[in-house]
Amino acid sequence: MNLSELSPKDGAKKRRRRVGRGIAAGQGASCGFGMRGQKSRSGTGTKAGFEGGQMPLYRRLPKLKHFPLYNPKHFTVVNVGKLAGLAPNTVVTLESLMEAGIVTSNDGPLKVLGNGELAVALTVHAPCSKAAQAKIEAAGGSVVAQG
């Protein structure tokens, strides 16, 4: 057996429909297009969404804006109040927060937000909001913003 000798099984391929070759051929006369009308004429017919002259649905509905991002960037978010339980002079990174049990899953880069109170001096190695940075520096800590 060679590749050149291969052929499909009997009945695996349907015969092409030959229209307009006489009534006895089965698809003569109107060739399966019915009697009259736009869809029986030659040419491409109607465009997608055409409703016979009626205002189509896609034009009746309002235009919607502000679709959500298809591939948004996710962050692991921690508020300043959660960092209050850490020991003084701790270096705060995503890895150290996972070891301490404050963060349970890595959803992306760490971002510190300003909700809550902080009285412990910490060194934060992550991007912070302005409110979070003010609270960390007011407690005697420092922020090394990355990214």
Curated annotation (Swiss-Prot):
It holds the Pfam family Ribosomal_L27A. Gene3D superfamilies: 3.100.10.10. The keyword Ribosomal protein applies. Residues 23-35 have a biased composition (Gly residues). The keyword Ribonucleoprotein applies. InterPro entries: Ribosomal_uL15 (IPR030878), Ribosomal_uL15/eL18 (IPR021131), Ribosomal_uL15/eL18_sf (IPR036227), Ribosomal_uL15_bac-type (IPR005749), Ribosomal_uL15_CS (IPR001196). Residues 1-52 are annotated as: Disordered. One of its GO terms (molecular function) is structural constituent of ribosome. GO terms for cellular component: cytosolic large ribosomal subunit. Coiled coil: none annotated. Keywords: Ribonucleoprotein, Ribosomal protein, RNA-binding, rRNA-binding. One of its GO terms (biological process) is translation. Belongs to the universal ribosomal protein uL15 family. Part of the 50S ribosomal subunit. PANTHER family: 50S RIBOSOMAL PROTEIN L15, LARGE RIBOSOMAL SUBUNIT PROTEIN UL15M. Binds to the 23S rRNA. This is Large ribosomal subunit protein uL15.
